[in-house]
């Protein structure tokens, strides 16, 4: 009979559907699945589809009160990962009606919620998501985007330069503001609060905001260029975060900052909406990302977190460097950098992109390269990231032997020295060091910086590598 039959049945009988034709409105996910010994890959893939959509561990009679066929996730393809023992890529399609409009929070609660603790799997990693255009149109996305930011700043044809103020913790507000002034006066476009600078006993947020605003307006007046300092509005409550953003707007500064993973997607989306409505740019730091994305077989790849940020909203986001001290393999990094900036990105497994992604009219996000970079890296960074990026030197500015302002001068000279020959068709990858040495002849600040950092390398193999 067709009636309700209690008991446990295999997931694959309901949720593994290799004949399924995906729809344009489906959210598609690529999971790296490592099943427990004895669990067939089809059952593991179907279990992921079930537990992240309508399924549970046993048959329930209330299944009969809805149309499971309409709402269930479906594992529609499974591929073995070459060169890895017992690893598979399981492709899952989710009907769009499973998700609340305009909510990254709800999307992740479903797709990467309970399923990651599932016992039948040894490990599970979400490698990529295809977000359909119908769902993307329910998001505001970045407050302003790349072109609007360039127009606000009146800066074109080159990457933007930033610097994280160090030591990251312990400075008083006035000394902090002084460092901001010196860096901006020396030629940088932005300075930055470190991600863990919120409102601590040694420097309360309001004092920092006031001294940083004074510093950037003074530097602006003296250089004739528009300057910014990423004022970190991240706080313990959403209300406090909004209070800080409102105060920044009242000071007339151009940009605020948020730690979007520790702060949470709900808070981030609220802040992004406020920033668009009030003309503030929004810089996003990815603190905590490596907890989620560092392991190759478990967690979630950063390209998914990057896509989620573009939907939730941010004008800049940290994206690794390829050449500095933090993780970032070149092809993979450029894959998600394109996902942040471009309107349309083709599927390309050689860059880790599992699905073609159409962003329709959602503005782009500027990738920020930061972490252990200095003047010798400038040719490579200019070559790899191109104009639409922010190159952020913390120690690579403030560690200059002559002080902060000369450190900023060295970075600006190195950047201008790389952009000009690149525009003339010279090969920065091959001639980069020679170009920097040439520029040292007419910039003593750059020459001093080159001398200090000539031996520094971070030679470690990347953890995040492509499958064979």
Swiss-Prot record:
UniProt-annotated location(s): Plastid, Chloroplast
Reactions catalysed: 2 (2R)-3-phosphoglycerate + 2 H(+) = D-ribulose 1,5-bisphosphate + CO2 + H2O; D-ribulose 1,5-bisphosphate + O2 = 2-phosphoglycolate + (2R)-3-phosphoglycerate + 2 H(+)
Binding-site residues for substrate, renumbered to this chain: 114, 164, 168, 286, 318, 370
Any GO BP annotation: reductive pentose-phosphate cycle
Residues where N6,N6,N6-trimethyllysine is found: 5
Post-translational modification summary for this protein: The disulfide bond which can form in the large chain dimeric partners within the hexadecamer appears to be associated with oxidative stress and protein turnover.
Major enzyme class: lyase
Gene Ontology MF terms in the entry: magnesium ion binding; monooxygenase activity; ribulose-bisphosphate carboxylase activity
Keyword field: Calvin cycle, Carbon dioxide fixation, Chloroplast, Disulfide bond, Lyase, Magnesium, Metal-binding, Methylation, Monooxygenase, Oxidoreductase, Photorespiration, Photosynthesis, Plastid
CDD domains attached to this UniProt entry: RuBisCO_large_I
Signal sequence bounds: none
Misc note: The basic functional RuBisCO is composed of a large chain homodimer in a 'head-to-tail' conformation. In form I RuBisCO this homodimer is arranged in a barrel-like tetramer with the small subunits forming a tetrameric 'cap' on each end of the 'barrel'.
Subunit architecture: Heterohexadecamer of 8 large chains and 8 small chains; disulfide-linked. The disulfide link is formed within the large subunit homodimers.
The protein's name: Ribulose bisphosphate carboxylase large chain
Originating species: Capsicum baccatum (Peruvian pepper)
């Amino acid at each position: 009979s067709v009636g309700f039959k209690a008991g446990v049945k295999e997931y694959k009988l309901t949720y593994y559907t290799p004949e399924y034709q995906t729809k344009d409105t489906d959210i598609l996910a690529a999971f790296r699945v490592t099943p427990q010994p004895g669990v067939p890959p089809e059952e593991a893939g179907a279990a992921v589809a079930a537990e992240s959509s309508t399924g549970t561990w046993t048959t329930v009679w209330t299944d009969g009160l809805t149309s499971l066929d309409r709402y269930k996730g479906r594992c529609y393809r499974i591929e073995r990962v070459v060169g890895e023992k017992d690893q598979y890529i399981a492709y899952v399609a989710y009907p769009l009606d499973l998700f609340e409009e305009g909510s990254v929070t709800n999307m992740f609660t479903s797709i990467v919620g309970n399923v990651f603790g599932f016992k039948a799997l040894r490990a599970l990693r979400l490698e990529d998501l295809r977000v359909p255009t119908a769902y993307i149109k329910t998001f505001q996305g970045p407050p302003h985007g790349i072109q609007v930011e360039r127009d606000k700043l009146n800066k074109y044809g080159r990457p933007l330069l930033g610097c994280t103020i160090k030591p990251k913790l312990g400075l008083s507000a006035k000394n902090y503001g002084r460092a901001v002034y010196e860096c901006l006066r020396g030629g940088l476009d932005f300075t930055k609060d470190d991600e863990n600078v919120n409102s601590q006993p040694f420097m309360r947020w309001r004092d920092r905001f006031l001294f940083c605003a004074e510093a950037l307006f003074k530097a602006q007046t003296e250089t004739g260029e528009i300057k910014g300092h990423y004022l970190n509005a991240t706080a313990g409550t959403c209300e406090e975060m909004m209070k800080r953003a409102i105060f920044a707007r009242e000071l007339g500064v151009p940009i605020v900052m948020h730690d979007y993973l520790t702060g949470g997607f709900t808070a981030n989306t609220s802040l992004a909406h406020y920033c668009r409505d009030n003309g503030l740019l929004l810089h996003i730091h990815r603190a905590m990302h490596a907890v989620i994305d560092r392991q190759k077989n478990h967690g979630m790849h950063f390209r998914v977190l990057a896509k989620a940020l573009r939907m939730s909203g941010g004008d800049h986001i940290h994206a690794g460097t390829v050449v500095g001290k933090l993780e970032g393999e070149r092809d993979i990094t450029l894959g998600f950098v394109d996902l942040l900036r471009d309107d349309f990105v083709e599927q390309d497994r050689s860059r880790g992109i599992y699905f073609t992604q159409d962003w329709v009219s959602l503005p782009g996000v500027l990738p920020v390269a930061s972490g252990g970079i200095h003047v010798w890296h400038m040719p490579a960074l200019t070559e790899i990231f191109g104009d639409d990026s922010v190159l952020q030197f913390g120690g690579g500015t403030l560690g200059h032997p002559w002080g902060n302002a000369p450190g900023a001068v060295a970075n600006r000279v190195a950047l201008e020295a790389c952009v000009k020959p690149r525009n003339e068709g010279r090969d920065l990858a091959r001639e980069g060091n020679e170009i920097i040495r040439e520029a040292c002849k007419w910039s003593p600040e750059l020459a001093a910086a080159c001398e200090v950092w000539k031996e520094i390398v971070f030679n470690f193999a990347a953890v995040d590598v492509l499958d064979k």
